[in-house]
Amino acid sequence: MPMTDFLFTSESVSEGHPDKVADQVSDAILDAILDQDRQSRVACETMVTTGMAVIAGEITTNARVEYPKVVREVIRDIGYNDSAMGFDWETCAVLTSIDRQSPDISQGVTEGAGLFKEQGAGDQGLMFGYACDETSVLMPMPITYAHQLTQRMSEVRKSGLLTFLRPDSKSQVSVQYINDKPVRVDTVVVSSQHAPDVAYETLREALIEEVIKKVVPADMLDENTKFYVNPTGRFVVGGPQGDCGLTGRKIIVDTYGGQGSHGGGAFSGKDPSKVDRSASYMARYVAKNVVAAKLARKCEVQIAYAIGVAEPVSIMVNTFGTGVLPSNEIARIVREEFDMRPAAIIETLDLLRPIYRKTAAYGHFGRELPEFTWERTDRVDSLRGRAGL
């Protein structure tokens, strides 16, 4: 029996969170390489800690990239520009350890080189995409508000409106659902790193008035909504000084905030031959078009692959009982409409471009930027036609 009245919570972290610093560095390196050589194979991992950034991985490319320069530019743009923060773009050490892609993997993802002649998947695995009609961007409401809160904290910091904020921040939003529909925001948590000399009450009032109330619609707040602002009382030590950051540790923040499922693979630092990334983008594209076509209010798509094999080993569609047709019928329509072989995904979504640094903070999904081709809803008419609607 489905729950009829419940709270669902999602979180987001800002571009200055140490794990997100690592994601952005990995994707900035990927972009710098793709800008010169679009056939590159990139798997770039980053670790950031007090006074140091380390990049490592497997990269096969004809591009010539000055990796330390890219790393420092990302750290500067985020706002770590003072050694008092324990992490500073000008003075941090940058260490690199880069190898080439394994030839055994390469032959499986290079057209004509492996047992199968088509470009195969870069690894086995399962990937999910999700969409629902709770927001205009067809994303769950909790993660949508959570991302907007962390983005707003970045905006007021960089614009100079709240000069005492520093780059590392987090948000969390709990939404009440009744009969599977979001009706109100129950709890908002925001935490932001700050200068040591700001009074707590000044910080709290500023974050409520200039962040929370600027993001969450007034009709979703009521007298029972709870605000928790920097609930430890002090957040001066933050960023890579406060916690070691690693690429790929915020996979739920990157996707749907815990709604839907996740196959476990991270995105950042991976070129689109890695289906962890490209097939997850494709699954979102499929699910979003199904919901936009009003074939269902909610849609989850699973795609699974074998390494070196182009055709997915399985495609599953679940509409959670909200479909105008049975899920297996929508799955049949999806298989007819979308080509989910890796090379076709790359072509359909035009993924061999330096577009990835923008994805690495504030969510890979639900932001309708021109570069985010997987957010298009250009298959609606075709899907409705196939469904006979």
Curated annotation (Swiss-Prot):
The record ties this protein, via PROSITE patterns, to:
ADOMET_SYNTHASE_1, ADOMET_SYNTHASE_2
Which pathway, per its entry? Amino-acid biosynthesis; S-adenosyl-L-methionine biosynthesis; S-adenosyl-L-methionine from L-methionine: step 1/1
Residue positions binding ATP = 17, 168-170, 234-235, 243, 249-250, 266, 270
Reply yes or no: does the keyword Hydrolase apply. no
Single Gene Ontology BP annotation: one-carbon metabolic process
Q: What main location does UniProt list?
A: cytoplasm
Q: Which UniProt keywords apply?
A: ATP-binding, Cytoplasm, Magnesium, Metal-binding, Nucleotide-binding, One-carbon metabolism, Potassium, Transferase
Any GO MF annotation of the entry: ATP binding
Q: Which residues bind L-methionine?
A: 58, 101, 243, 274
Residues covered by region (Flexible loop): 101-111
Which EC class is the enzyme in?
transferase
Provide the reaction this enzyme catalyses.
L-methionine + ATP + H2O = S-adenosyl-L-methionine + phosphate + diphosphate
Matching InterPro entries, A to Z?
Answer: ADOMET_SYNTHASE_CS (IPR022631), S-AdoMet_synt_C (IPR022630), S-AdoMet_synt_central (IPR022629), S-AdoMet_synt_N (IPR022628), S-AdoMet_synthetase (IPR002133), S-AdoMet_synthetase_sfam (IPR022636)
Recorded GO CC terms? cytoplasm
Q: Where in the cell is it found?
A: Cytoplasm
Q: What's the EC number here?
A: 2.5.1.6
The entry's family comment says:
Belongs to the AdoMet synthase family.
What name does this protein carry?
A: S-adenosylmethionine synthase
Species of provenance: Syntrophotalea carbinolica (strain DSM 2380 / NBRC 103641 / GraBd1) (Pelobacter carbinolicus)
